[in-house]
Amino acid sequence: EQTGDWKRVRHNYLETLTQMFVDRWAKPMSAYCDRKGMLWTGHYWEHDWPSMYQGGDNMAMYAWHQMPAIDMLFNQYNDQSPQAQFGNVRAVKELRSAANQTGSVRTLSETYGGGGWDETFRDFKRLGDWEYALGVNFMNQHLSHMTIVGARKYDYPPVFTRLSPWWEDYKVLNDYFARLSLVLSQGEQMNDILVLEPTTTIWLYYSYVMNDPRCMEIGSAFQRFVTTLEKAQAEYDLGSENIIKDRGSVRGGKFVVGKRAYAKVVIPPMTENLNAGTFSLIRQFVEAGGQLVLFAQPTLVDGRPSPELADFLDRNASRIRRYTALDGKAIAESFADDRIRFCNVRGNDLYHQRRTYEDGELLFLVNSSLSDTATGSVGLPAGELVELDAVTGDMRPYPHTADGKSVGADFSLPPAGSLLLFAPASGRSALARTSRAASGTERPTAGSVKLEPAGPLEVTRLKDNVLNLDFCDLTVDGRTERNLYTFEACNKLFNHCYGTGNPWDSAIQYR
């Protein structure tokens, strides 16, 4: 019930559960893998966030993996729901941010599960590009059945074995993601902005027995917030208060979380609570000249009203930026970065990742739309641009303008298209000198290459086609039900004969 000191009680309860999960499971297993020279991986996030019943803080758990990981199911792009899979910006940004802060080189995704038998190479590329742009750099394809007899046919296909007709051609796509995995695990993603997750505020409203609708309202508001930032090409990391507790400090006017130091800290909409350790560091950060950006004014510390927090925010009002909405003005004032500039962007599904190498900057652009082209221009501090073709492994100069300090380039990405660029720090790069294309030549883009036929095309049927029956009539003990979906009919039959559902569904049979 929401009575008495209920916010503090819920906060402390979920904080205790989360910390016990870390202390009694994540830390010992991480230490064991360190001793044995193994990389521990796996995914914690499920598909019900901001519900907390499967864990109190996803990012807190990632911090103890040698290779933090997520899964990414299905093939329906949804960039709105906090419980979506493909399209869920927050889920992948949590992974990438934790890896940045802990120094994990590789981030894994179990990808494509449940996408269906009809997924195409274009679908595979589109989903993979999207999650790689947001922070994944190692892929584990789901799934590789040894057999598809019976109910296995609908056990979360596609199937990555010779049982799929495209298997012999899949190497092309695998090589593509292998090259992306290499370049996106080199260098560092160095973001200057830390956006706190409202996890400890959600704790106040989450209940195992009677969830408050405000829980989903906070989660949805945060989902919109990070998705808007991502589509505005802002560069930022997300912050877990549990990770901040263990790895946070203030040094040189920066808010430090592990291996990352941030010049700005952002408190997102609907945030009510800060943990005591987080508040202490924010206070030190602002007093040291750091920039605090508020889209909400928290009033609680550890679930209790805090006059000290209110006084701090009032006394430092002139040093704190406050916004009521994440609009164009807020993005331009508080999220712009001189290290990369986007102009005249058209297309609502453009994503990017920029990584800093010792000798330059790497930029990966993807267009996740299946219908619209994404166009615009981008500027980077460099002397030239080189395109890295992740399909062929080729390197070639990319058309650009230069003023001695920076380069500017136009891009046009077709639906499900991508572009990988490298901007050398200074001088002319060895990549450009050894490239196969001449500088300034017109660059064909994916989807724009015309293939001429080598001769007449003839298609021959090798064997009779299979006619799939999705609906059927079922007769059991003289009683007939008509037009049932075959999956439902199977369950009814198994229930009648054995008193249980289909034992072949989501189960293992050895005979």
Model regions and ranges:
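Carbohydrate-binding surfaces of carbohydrate-active enzymes
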Residues: 1-511
